[in-house]
Amino acid sequence: MHTILLVVFMIILGAIIGGVTNMIAIKMLFHPFKPYYIFRFRIPFTPGLIPKRREEIARKIGQVIEEHLITEELIRQKLNQPQSRNMIQQLIHKQISKLKNDDVTIKKIAGFLGIDVNELVDYKLTTKFLNKLNFWYESNKYRKLSEILPQSFLDQCKGQIEYITDFLCERARNYLSSEKGERDIYEMLDTFFNEKGRIIGLLQMFMTKESIADRIQHELIRLTQHPQSQKIITKVLNDEYEIFKDKNLDEIIKEQQFKNYSQLVLNELKTYLNLKDKTERPIKQVVPQFIQFLEDDTSKRMTDFIIKGTSKHLTNIMKKINLRQLVEEQINTFDLKYIENLIIDIANKELKLIMTLGFILGGIIGFFQGVIAIFV
């Protein structure tokens, strides 16, 4: 009887020691949050592992996101997908459709170009009109766009940048929230785990890949809603818009393209007998085909221009955004208690299994110690 009690006591004692040891080890991952000192000597294991390596963890997560999750190549692929093209073209269509509700007349447009429409009745319409347009183009093709267009029009264009920012953020959220986005994040995370270092391996002891991928997906979606991210995107778009305004006319519209557009306008004008009346009526009534042309042809060209321009300058955009630093700074702003609760919430089941395993292993070791004690 004494022998059995000894073995049982050793099992219980070993289980308690093993379980409590694992509980303390888990707590020491997070606690204490700051170092403690006795006189001038720092107490070992203070602060805890995660508080001590917090900046390194944030840096690694930022590196993962920038180099393997939100990459330039991935963004280029998404921009060139048919769905993205359709969304951009719909946005342009929406802006062009506003012309249908404006009272812009041909006379106003011709006046902006320095053309007296009434003179066209007395002169050879074709020669006069085309020569005038060609002269205007030759006179202005080396001038900046900001020097040619009215300030009110430039301000209106600039006012659309916030809508583009919202559109880009919304598209990013839609992708990250989709099954495809979730699968891409998991696959890239899995590849990274197979290639990269120790800190990620340490995290994987307490969190499954699915949990990490889910958390990254959640944080990326939240990042697209963060005001600072939207400010950065808006600033980049504003900078690119300023660059675009500073381009010469011939960089935007080639001479042959300008001639084609001029001929199109001329053909429309020739279809009307009462030219003066027609030129003073709104474009939406006079030349509805022109609006249709803008919707069908120009919108496609503008869509291609936006996608090609964005893809061309994507490297500079990503450098200006500095996604790695943005993520790192965001994680470093998290309260340590919040990080602890976050990890425990995600890996709660696994942590409980570790503590249970400590009790079991401690009990097994206690059993063998009891058996050895009997024979000693």
From Swiss-Prot:
Belongs to the UPF0754 family. One of its GO terms (cellular component) is plasma membrane. InterPro entries: DUF445, UCP032178. It is found in: Cell membrane. It comes from the Bacteria. It is a multi-pass membrane protein. The keyword Cell membrane applies. The chain crosses the membrane at residues 4-24, 356-376. Keywords: Cell membrane, Membrane, Transmembrane, Transmembrane helix. This is UPF0754 membrane protein SE_1527. Pfam families: DUF445. It comes from Staphylococcus epidermidis (strain ATCC 12228 / FDA PCI 1200). Its main location: membrane.
